[in-house]
């Protein structure tokens, strides 16, 4: 059982209806190999919109050089999907790597600028024991399934961003970043991401916030406003997920 309440706007009726979907999925008559190519049968429209959203932001960076950084990977779906979108939109671009950052043990702590709740608390969004190994294996599989599989185009960075990100940037001074996806909800890691990653952006790079302008999760917005980054970016919202905010860096 999870030790937190995932943030969503789901009604009680929707929650009840989803129990039916879970049963249909668990009791599916489809063979496993057919399940894997017919996942749309069990994909809700709200979940499908996330796929369209990731395609939306990826298409904004196709002509922008640099890697993709995902902060707050959790189970890693965004990392896998962005990795496969690279294979779809630019299969021969071996220079673009998808890098995922997470503790894989949940939030280490919160600052006074964050709002503690059943969703935001120490240990929330933890994964199963050794889950990073499973995610690594999944990414290895997708790498081998796609073109130019002999060149590694993904990386997972485990640990607290406050420590791992400065070390990563020091080790990768050559790096440009085309897309930053911030899904950490908290003040301190958001501040660290902005401070460490901005020097690696180029004009046209994209910064995506998952919980901007959200009263329940003030940390991301406070860190962004304090940084002054809003003065150097064009701001828009996603066409598919209205609570996702897209910043286009103008340098």
Segments predicted by a language model, with ranges:
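S-adenosylmethionine/decaboxylated-SAM
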Residues: 15-39, 45, 62, 67-251
């Amino acid at each position: 059982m999870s030790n937190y309440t995932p943030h969503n706007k789901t009604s009680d009726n929707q929650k009840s209806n989803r129990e039916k979907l879970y049963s249909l999925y668990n009791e599916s008559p489809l063979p496993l190999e057919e399940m894997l190519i017919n996942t749309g049968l069990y994909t809700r429209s709200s979940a499908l919109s996330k796929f369209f959203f990731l395609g939306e932001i990826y298409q904004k960076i196709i002509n922008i050089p640099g890697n993709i950084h995902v902060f707050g990977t959790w189970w890693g779906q965004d990392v896998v999907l962005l990795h496969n979108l690279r294979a779809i939109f630019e299969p021969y671009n071996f220079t673009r790597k998808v890098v995922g950052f997470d503790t894989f043990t949940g939030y280490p702590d919160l600052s006074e600028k964050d709002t503690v709740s059943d969703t935001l608390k120490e240990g929330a969004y933890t994964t199963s024991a050794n889950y990073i190994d499973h995610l690594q294996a999944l990414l290895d599989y997708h790498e081998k399934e796609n073109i130019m599989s002999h060149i590694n185009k993904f990386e997972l960075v485990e640990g607290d961003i406050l420590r791992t990100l400065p070390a990563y940037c020091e080790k990768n001074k050559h790096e440009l970043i085309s897309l930053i996806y911030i899904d950490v909800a908290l003040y301190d890691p958001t501040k660290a991401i902005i401070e460490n990653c901005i020097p690696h952006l180029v004009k046209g790079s994209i910064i995506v916030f998952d919980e901007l302008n959200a009263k329940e999760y003030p940390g991301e917005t406070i860190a962004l406003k304090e940084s002054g980054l809003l003065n150097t970016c064009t701001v828009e919202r996603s066409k598919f997920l209205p609570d996702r905010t897209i910043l286009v860096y103008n340098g």
